[in-house]
Amino acid sequence: MTLVSFFTYTARTLSKERKEGSLAFWHSMPISDSKAIAVKLVFALVIIPIIASFLLLFADLTVWFVGQWFVPQSLLTDYSVNLVALGQHYGEFISTMAAMSLALLPVACIIFFISQFNEHPLITIFVIILLIKIMGSIVFNSTVIGDWISQVNNLSINILMSDHPWGTLMAIGSPTLMGLLIIAVTFFVLTVRFRAGK
């Protein structure tokens, strides 16, 4: 749910501004383009996961509450359905979301940039990735570039599925993490400049 909401929001929020004409309104307000983009990033990478965590907490508490009334205590103990386990589960989810949000930062910046001049940024990114993989394989006669792109592309999913999300994030290596940070900053700046009409 978090990933679906993330991709839906990032793909539509900036293009929606241009379609509805609200961009001119926001430019008339005392809010810089960099702050506006930063707020959208915070919503995509922080607020959406927090909302998802509240839904998870509500579901866990509902299971616990129903269990107290209708399930034998011995069965609840066997399946670790108690407040301590629920708290631990919630904490693990928050930790996973934090690691995943860091992995999604460059993705969000790239989507924001492409979505300003393309109505289907996700399809565009998919095609670009496919072309890079094919060209890398043809030109260099190697799948190294394609393998690296796949590793980065699947990072958020791997983190989500991992029992050790931070270990999965760090496992891609410091050079790759630094490269992703540079990509994020570069596309953030490009997005701000494009939104400002520069």
Predicted segments, located by residue:
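Residue-level signal for alpha-helical transmembrane segments in multi-pass membrane proteins
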Residues: S5-R12, L57, L61-T62, G136-V139, ...
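Transmembrane helix boundary and interhelical loop/hinge segments in multi-pass membrane proteins
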Residues: F7-H27, L41
